[in-house]
Design a protein with these regions (language model features):
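Positively charged, small/polar-rich N-terminal and surface patches that mediate targeting and assembly
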Residues: 1-119
Length: 119
């Protein structure tokens, strides 16, 4: 049996690096607008903390990285939603970026494939 797969070519990965505990705030904000497929993982930040020596102990290096793949036509709306939910307009809260994806692959149900066949 030949295996086949469907690739998505009009997708963007939005990534937010935020303070520990903020990942759930972001996923809740995404769920409110129907986005269910985000991923959170823990990270450790390095940089200014090390340069401050003993004073660096006061800086929390724990971070969370939230990633979500979205359709390219939804990027602006979802990017803004994450930015506001994570309060990234406050210094020290984190940063985010969007990466265009050349290809992404996952299981797509036949009912969805037939809906978009020929487009």
């Amino acid at each position: 049996m030949k295996r086949s797969f469907t690739t998505l070519t009009d997708a963007t990965l939005i990534t937010a690096v935020v303070q520990s505990g903020c990942g759930e705030v972001i996923t809740d904000a995404l769920l409110e607008i129907g986005i269910q497929g985000s991923t959170i993982h823990a990270a450790m930040g390095v940089g200014i903390r090390e340069r401050l020596g003993a004073l660096g102990v006061a800086i929390d290096a724990e971070r969370e990285v939230v990633s979500v793949m979205v359709s390219s036509d939804e990027v602006d709306r979802i990017f803004e939603r994450i930015f506001l939910a994570a309060k990234l307009d406050v210094p020290g809260m984190g940063f985010m970026y969007a990466t265009p994806l050349l290809q992404a692959a996952t299981y797509v149900p036949p009912s969805i494939l037939s809906k978009y066949a020929g487009q």
